[in-house]
Amino acid sequence: MQGGWSQRQACRQLDLPERRANRWLRRREAGRLADAKPGGSPMHAILEQEAEAILAVFQEWAEVDRSHRKLAHRGSYLGRFWCSPSTVRRVLLLGDKHFRPRPQPGKSVKSPFPDWAALVPNSIWIYDSTHFTACSMTVLIIEDLISRKWLTHLVSVEETHTQVQNAFTAALEAEGLLENALQRAGTGQVDPGAEDGLNPILLAVSDNGSQMISRDTRTFMTLLAIAQHFGRPSTPTDQAWIESLNGTIKTEWPYLLAITDPAVLRAELDVVQHAYNSVRLHQGIGYVTPNDEHEGRGEAIRQARRDGMAKARLHRLARHRAERENQPNPRTP
């Protein structure tokens, strides 16, 4: 424009709306040519005294509430401020205020099995109770931890040391261990830590249920030379083997959950126990039945499969090579 151009000509040449040029000129005269701070001024913005009230309540109640959500309700509960939890969180972040995290319990360490407990069948048993609510019954199941054989079960309306004693007595009799257990306990030398001490007949693994840790159960186990091993509280993975068995029973035989007659439940559990031990291939022990593993046939069956797979591969290779040699070669004159 200093060169004689009019404002309209200059705007047309610069492809600039004349209205915008007028606005810039007015802002220059007012000393506001520099860009203002971006963003508007929301009408619902929190007031300065409200932010101060939030920070004050934080100082007083942070150790009690430990959450911006609770602090937002604490403010209205005390009549100090009324705003949303997100607003409280934003004000605290801008004020560099943070809640102190709650102290976390230390991580527990799983207790290993004792060294004398061999990883062979009839050395480590695991047991637990599961519920069938349709008939209001509790089933205590004992499983061999190594072979995964379902040893025995007891259906009862109670969960006491009596059921534990009866179930273990039946399992020891079925496995032919009861007389040996009584004889070993009668020597009075069952002490794996002593130099001349005898090892317990087996290790019984369980959770910390009242019937498992009771004095009567402990006395019964001592009389039969059975050592006890308990998992960590509230840690069902320490008893994953028996938890898996309970889940498998209810998942693969779901009709058991609908039985309302305890006598029918007992009969059906006997049928399911036979199918589980003798028919169903168990993935956890290499796809053999628990009876196979418990009676020592498991490794032979697994080796026979490996040998059969290798033999079948060689047979397929030989067959395909022979068929290829029988085909005429079009390139041969």
Locate the predicted segments by residue.
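Mobile-element integrase/transposase regions
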Residues: Q49, Y77, F81-W82, S86, ...
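RNase H-like polynucleotidyl transferase catalytic core
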Residues: K37, I201-N208, T222-W241, L256-P262
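Short alpha-helical "recognition helix" segments of helix-turn-helix
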Residues: Q7-L14, L71
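Residue-level signal for the short linker/turn that defines the boundary of a DNA-recognition helix
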Residues: G4-S6, R66, C83, T260
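Basic, flexible linker segments flanking DNA-binding modules
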Residues: N22-I124, R184-V190, T235, H294-Q303
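C-terminal domain-tail junction helix/linker
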Residues: T222-I226, T248-P333
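Residue-level detector of anion-binding/catalytic polar loops
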Residues: S6, P17, H98, A227
